[in-house]
C-alpha cells in the first residue's frame, strides 16, 4: 500500500491528490493520510492554519488511510514517527525506510513503490500531466450558496469568455512574513510581471488582464491600465472561487504559488499560454533546461524578466 500525506494549502492538496490519482490509475493500492490537519502541534507551527479543502470540490473522491493501515506501512517507525533516530535513518538509508520524503523537483522512483509513506508537495506537472484531462473532470467547483457572490462570479466568467482573457496572480500575504520571506520573495518581481504581460500583449493586443491577489490595495496601486480588472470579492472559504475564475481565463500568469498553478492547469482552453516563474523558492537551483523538460507546455520567466525559450 502507498500512503500519501495530505498537507499544506489547497494547491498543495490538489497536487497530492493528483499523484494519488496517477498512482491509482497504475493499479496501485493508494490511500490519503489526512491526519495532518487534525494535528494541533503541526498547525501551531504554521503562519496560517490550514484546513482540508479537497472536499470543497464536488467530483473528488479518495480513500483515507486508517491508523492501522498507516501502522502497517510504517512498522516500528510508527512508534518513533518524528524522533531524531527515525529522521536520521531516513536520510542515511532512504531505500530501507518506509518513508519517502520529496527532496527534488521530480522523483521518477515513486512510480515503482509498493509499500511507502510519501511526504511531499509533488508540484512538478510531469507526475500527472497525462491525466490532467481526467482531473479537470473531477475538480468541479460547486455553486456558491451566496446568491450575490454566485452572480458576481458568473458575470466575471462571462467577461472572461468574451475576451482574450488573462489571469494574473500576485501573492504577497504570508510570503512577506517570517521565514517565508527568505524562501519566496523577489521571485515574482515587477520585472517578472512586466515581462509576462508584455509577452502576452505582443501576441494578443486585445488581451484583458484579470488580477487576483491577497493584497488588492497593493495591486491597485502598482498596476493601472484600462485593460486591467481586479477580482476582489472572493474571501475566506470562498477564496477557492478565485481558482475557478483563473481557470476560465484563456491564458494564465502565475505567481510562485501552487494555487495559481492549478488555476492554469484547470484551464481547458486550447491553445493557451501558461506562464510561471523560473523557480519556486530561493533555495531551489534553477537549471533552465531541466525546468523546461519538467514543465513542458509552460513559458518560464526569470525574476529579472527574461523569457526562457
Regions found by a protein language model. Name each.
Residues 45-199, 203-204, 302-304, 309:
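Secretory-pathway luminal glycosyltransferase catalytic domains
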Residues 1-6, 31-32, 116-119, 162-174, ...:
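Short hydrophobic beta-strand segments
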Residues 42-57, 219-227, 287-294:
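Short, aromatic/basic amphipathic alpha-helical patches
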Residues 282-309:
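Leloir-type glycosyltransferase catalytic cores
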Residues 10, 194, 198-285, 290:
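Donor-binding and catalytic core of enzymes assembling or modifying cell-surface/extracellular glycoconjugates
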Residues 5-13, 185-189, 238, 256:
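Aromatic-acidic/polar surface patches that form glycan- and anion
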Amino acid at each position: 500500500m502507498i500512503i500519501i500525506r495530505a498537507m499544506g494549502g489547497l494547491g498543495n492538496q490538489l497536487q497530492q491528490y493528483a499523484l494519488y490519482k496517477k498512482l491509482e490509475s497504475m493499479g496501485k493500492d493508494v490511500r490519503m493520510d489526512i491526519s495532518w490537519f487534525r494535528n494541533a502541534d503541526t498547525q501551531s507551527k504554521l503562519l496560517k492554519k490550514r484546513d482540508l479543502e479537497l472536499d470543497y470540490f464536488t467530483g473528488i473522491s479518495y480513500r483515507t488511510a486508517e491508523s492501522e493501515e498507516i501502522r502497517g506501512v510504517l512498522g516500528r517507525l510508527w512508534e518513533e514517527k518524528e524522533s531524531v533516530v527515525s529522521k536520521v535513518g531516513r536520510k542515511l538509508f532512504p531505500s530501507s525506510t518506509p518513508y519517502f520524503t520529496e527532496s527534488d523537483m521530480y522523483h521518477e522512483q515513486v512510480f515503482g513503490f509498493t509499500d511507502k509513506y510519501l511526504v511531499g508537495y509533488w508540484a512538478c506537472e510531469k507526475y500527472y500531466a497525462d491525466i490532467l484531462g481526467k482531473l479537470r473532470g473531477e475538480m468541479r467547483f460547486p455553486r456558491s450558496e451566496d446568491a450575490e457572490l454566485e452572480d458576481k462570479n458568473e458575470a466575471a466568467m462571462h467577461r472572461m469568455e468574451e475576451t482574450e482573457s488573462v489571469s494574473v496572480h500576485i501573492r504577497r500575504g504570508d510570503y512577506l512574513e517570517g521565514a517565508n520571506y527568505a524562501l519566496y520573495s523577489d521571485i515574482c518581481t515587477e520585472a517578472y510581471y512586466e515581462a509576462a504581460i508584455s509577452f502576452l500583449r505582443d501576441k494578443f493586443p486585445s488581451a484583458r488582464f484579470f488580477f487576483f491577489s491577497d493584497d488588492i490595495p497593493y495591486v491597485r496601486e502598482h498596476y493601472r491600465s484600462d485593460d486591467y480588472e481586479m477580482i476582489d470579492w472572493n474571501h475566506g472559504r470562498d477564496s477557492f472561487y478565485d481558482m475557478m475564475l483563473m481557470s476560465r481565463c484563456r491564458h494564465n500568469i502565475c505567481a510562485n504559488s501552487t494555487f495559481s498553478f492549478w488555476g492554469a492547469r484547470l484551464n481547458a482552453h486550447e491553445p493557451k499560454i501558461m506562464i510561471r516563474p523560473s523557480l519556486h523558492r530561493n533555495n531551489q537551483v534553477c537549471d533552465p533546461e531541466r525546468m523546461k523538460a519538467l514543465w513542458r507546455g509552460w513559458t518560464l520567466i526569470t525574476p529579472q524578466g527574461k523569457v526562457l525559450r
